[in-house]
Amino acid sequence: MLCQGLLTGYILAHEMMHAYLRLKGYRILSPEVEEGICQVLAHLWLESEIVSGSSSSIATTSEAAAVAAEVAVAAEATATPSSTSSSAKKGEKTDFEKKLGEFFKHQIETDPSAIYGDGFRAGIRAVERYGLRGTLDHIKRSGSFPS
């Protein structure tokens, strides 16, 4: 994937999560919960792009991929063949792309804001403990992250 594709991809993952929440009938959520879970999906997308995962991250990124697929179908999104580079098709990342992806992940992880940063940290703890699907189910029922 081209380097600008990392930034574009993680922003799209974040914004598509907003669409998923609306299209799947989630209640109006607090900004911390909504932006937090959207940042979690963006972070998981970045991880899937740059990290050869352990078994736990593979399961989490598989869940994220399933949710992303649901979002794409629900939003009737289409991909264009020209939107990927030959390196993305081969699954190869340059050292620069890996470092850039790690930088973007670090920015999400260390964001000092209450809404995006604290929301992400609460969301990622929930996803690590309950999985993405379990966390989303809890958010849909209660409007909050599971504790």
Placement of each model-derived feature along the sequence:
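Active-site recognition of the HExxH zinc-binding catalytic motif
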Residues: 10-23, 35-39
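Pan-zinc metallopeptidase signature
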Residues: 56, 73-147
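Short pre-active-site segment immediately N-terminal to the catalytic Zn-binding motif
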Residues: 1-12, 26-30
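A structural motif
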Residues: 8-12, 45, 89-96
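An active-site-proximal "capping" alpha-helix that borders the catalytic cofactor pocket
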Residues: 32-47
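Alpha-solenoid helical repeat scaffolds
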Residues: 22, 47-48, 129
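Internal, charge-rich low-complexity segments
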Residues: 47-68
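Intrinsically disordered, low-complexity regulatory regions associated with ubiquitination proteins
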Residues: 18, 61-82
